[in-house]
Every structure is written in C-alpha cells, then in structure tokens.
Amino acid sequence: MRIISWDVGVIYLAYCVLEYVLSKNKEVIINIIDWNIINLMENNRLVINCCGMKKGNTICDKKASYCLRTPDKKLFGYCKTHLTQYNINWSIQDTEKMFTKISKPDNTCTFLKKTGDFCGKKATYKYKNNKSTNYYCNVHYKSELKNRTKEFSPQPIKNTIVKKYPTAQLQYNLIKKLDKLSKHFAMLGIERVVIENQPSQKNPKMKSIASTLFDYFLIRGFCDKIHNIDIKLVRYMCPSNKLKVNKDNTLEVFKANKDSKKKYKLTKALGIQYTKQLLNNEQEQLDYLSLFEKKDDLCDAYLQGRYYLEFIMDKTDKNYPIIKCQENKFNKPNNDDLQNESGDDSETESSLSWENIKIEISDDQADYYAKKYNKSVMNKSNKLMMNKSMMNKSESNKKSNRKSNKRSNKNIITL
C-alpha cells in the first residue's frame, strides 16, 4: 500500500510518498517512492545573480538583493557588497544626457498635471527615449530629472509579504500545482492521503491551505477519480506525532524549554536528525535530501507518514470511514401495470414519493434522540392507544361543554 503525507505551509508544502510492505517474515518495510517541495509563490520574486567583479577579476554570481533596470530594459543584479559598481552599467550622468537643452523653444511643456491638463509653458528641455519624445519647462525639467534618476538606479528586490498576499491566490496556485502532479500521483498508485492538521485561530491562512488540500483529494481523487487515481482515505493528523517515531525521550527536552521560538527551532532540528537516523542505510535518499535548503519540511512529511504507517493505520482509521453513495432501490412496476386500456405497452413516467423511502434507526439511536429532545419513543401499538385515548378525551370534553351550556341557559333571566 502507498500513501502520501503532506507537511503544510503558507509558501512551501512538502509531500512524501511512502510504500508499506509486509515481508514473508512479517517484518514491516517502509520505502520512500517520491518526495519533493511545492513553492506556491516561486514566480513572484525576481531571481537574478550579482554581476559585480571581485578582486581576482571574477564575477561574484551571488544571489542579488538589488536590481538595475536601464532604459533599454536590461537587468543587472548586485549584492550589497558590489552595489557601488552599478555606475559601470548606468550612472547619473547617463540619465542627464537623455535631457537636451533647446535653443529655440518652439514647443510647449508636455508635463501632465493632476487636473489632467498639460503645463503649456514654453519648453526649454527635450527628453528623448527609445519610444517617445517629451518637452519640459525649467520647473518640470528638475522634477522629471529627479524621477528618471530614481527610476534608472538600483532598486531593492523585495520579497512578497505573505500577510498581504491574498489567500485565494495561494489556494488557486495550489490547485494548479496539484493538477500538474495529479497524473504523477495516479501512476504511483496512491491510496491514502495524510495531511498535517493546522490550528484555525493561530494561523487561518495556513488552515485554509490545509483545507484546500483536503478538498482537492476528496473531489479529484475520490469523487472524480482523475487519471484513474483511487483514493480510499483522506484524513488529518496531529503535528506532534511526527516526533514520536524515534524512541528517544524527547518530551523531557520540550518540557525543559518553555520558550515557543526555541521549541520551534528544536522541533525542526530534531525532525532532520530523526530522518537521517531512520535513513542511515539509504544513502541515495540522504544525498537527495542534501540538495534542498528547507530540509525540515521534507523530514516532517516523511516522519508524519512513517508514524501513520507504523502506529495509526488500521488501528484508528475506523473513525474515518469513507462514505459510499448508494442508489435508492425502488420497486419496479410489473409489465401488466404498464399496459394501457388498448393492451399496448407504453412508457409511463415514474414519480418518486416519500412512501418509497425508508429510514431505519436502531433502538440505541432512538433512545439517544429521545433523551436529547425529551421525547418518548413509541411503537405502533402505543401510538394507537394514544390516539384512542385522545379521541375519548375529546368526546368527553364535548359532552361536558354541552351540559355547561344548558346550565348557563337556565340561569339567564329575560326582561
């Protein structure tokens, strides 16, 4: 049997496909079939390397934190160390050369005001770009020169702020990523999906990602069965279980550290350590793990899936049944009933009524609902007895009302 375990994050999601094999000696063997990381925001940040030169006349080639965009739309990256070298590719003097002074002011200033009107004064400077040519007066020349100088200078490459990033966009990116991987998952023969549960109040954005992941496999894998994938179970798992795979006494270590930040770092460090210990005899997987910067996410997905296979599978999954839709069975009419007065067979429209639907409730369930809503459970005989007693009470009430009316009429005095 094969399962897929998911470690949930806002930007990075890690998955691990594990295979559960029971040998002839009844020894449990767990193999890693595939594991990887999904980045939900990889296309939003500019990735460029530093083009600055070192002392040995070699290119720095580090990850750039600043970017220079020239008027011809060329990009140059710089790190903090080599930021001062940007003047080699473009300088302030190059920006000033784009403005030329006009000797004969035949044109008017084309600066657009906030009101939507042009300045209209006599132009003294001409700005020429690759696409357009503009004219400016003395006042607006200074402001435009300042704006162009800022535009053609190195700008910091900012990371996308996760808190300001729309949750709906993250969910959309996740669905698109999963659609691309759905055929791959179907070929691996995944049967069960285990997702790390997230607290809804501490981080609602992460909870939304986990819910989207759960709904995707429930809809695509169980209902639609896209690419003939056969998902039989989708469930959440407590995040604290992944560190219980190793038999070391880690609870005492967590109790000693009351600081939440230290606990978080310790959890990540222990996850990587436990994974390396469990994969001690699998050098290929360890080499593959070393290629990733965020090893903790992959390790968490692996430990969670391993804990499920060794301690939870077939023991507590009875509480997570898969609901199968069954069609209602109605009595089919006989051929004699389908014949009309002329004796010919004719198709008749069949209508569904509440009489055809039967709902069966056990005695225990009936007692439970009776206690919950303070109602007594009665069988058919009790109902009939109740109806007869109610009829007798109503008849006796009518007779008593008639007698009281006669008595009241006798006491009336007519004038």
UniProtKB/Swiss-Prot annotation:
InterPro entries: RNaseH-like_sf, RNaseH_sf. GO terms for molecular function: nucleic acid binding. It comes from the Viruses. Residues 399-409 have a biased composition (Basic residues). Residues 338-348 have a biased composition (Acidic residues). Residues 329-351, 388-415 are annotated as: Disordered. Coiled coil: none annotated. Gene3D superfamilies: Ribonuclease H-like superfamily/Ribonuclease H (3.30.420.10). This is Uncharacterized protein L451. The lineage of its organism: Viruses, Varidnaviria, Bamfordvirae, Nucleocytoviricota, Megaviricetes.
